[in-house]
Amino acid sequence: KLVEQKDLDAVVVATPDHTHAVASVAAMRAGKHVYCEKPLCRTISEVRHVTDLARETNRVTQMGTQIHAGSNYRRVVELVRSGAIGEINEVHVWVGSSTGGRTRYQQFPASVPGNLDWDLWLGPIPEQPYHPGWTHFHWRHWWHFGGGTLADIGCHYMDLPFWALDLSHATSAEAEGPPVDKDSAPIWLKVRYQFPDRVVSGRHWKALPLTWYHGRYPNHILTPEQHKRWGSGILFVGSKGQLISNYGGHELLP
């Protein structure tokens, strides 16, 4: 009903991940422009449907990745592309915290809060009984609603190397983590992506690996003191030095 209002020009989609696609599609079909919070969608098929509809309806669209607009990330991009640390040989991205590793809740009677339309909240997800552990922040743990730490926070930290190095599709990916759970995202994960060579700002850049870590710190690349200081972050390893960054700052290293 909201998107049918004639006096609305655009819609901001900031719902849990599992309804990003359906909300964006409904808005574009109603002729509205869309600003959708990251991650754009939960599955590849949803992404294809949303992007096809954006082209078809010719609506103005943007995916919001908040840290991207800050001056710190822009400065890191400038340093990397200017050759301040030489040719980039590898990148490491890590987040010390984690969302996931939960055991599916036992079903027991729970009353739906009076201010919550549970059916509407589920959206495209198959019907299931209400549980408070599936709402608010905790929806991120579950495959039905989110994608764990990589989908939730990876968008922010991966944004920087993708931008600075003009990365696109990986040619391979190898993951290491706990046993796969059909309901819950992994509490820790290490993923090694391989990206092909490409041209960035008129320069040829060779293929390189990018490794993601969450739930466990990559102690082989930084000291405990550095982990404590930087928390989560990104490390560019170049032929002439290294560059470390997080949301709020960056530093050149030998």
Where in the sequence are the language-model features?
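Short beta-strand scaffold segments in enzyme catalytic cores
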Residues: 189-193, 234-236
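N-terminal Rossmann-like NAD(P) cofactor-binding module of classical short-chain dehydrogenase/reductase
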Residues: 9-12
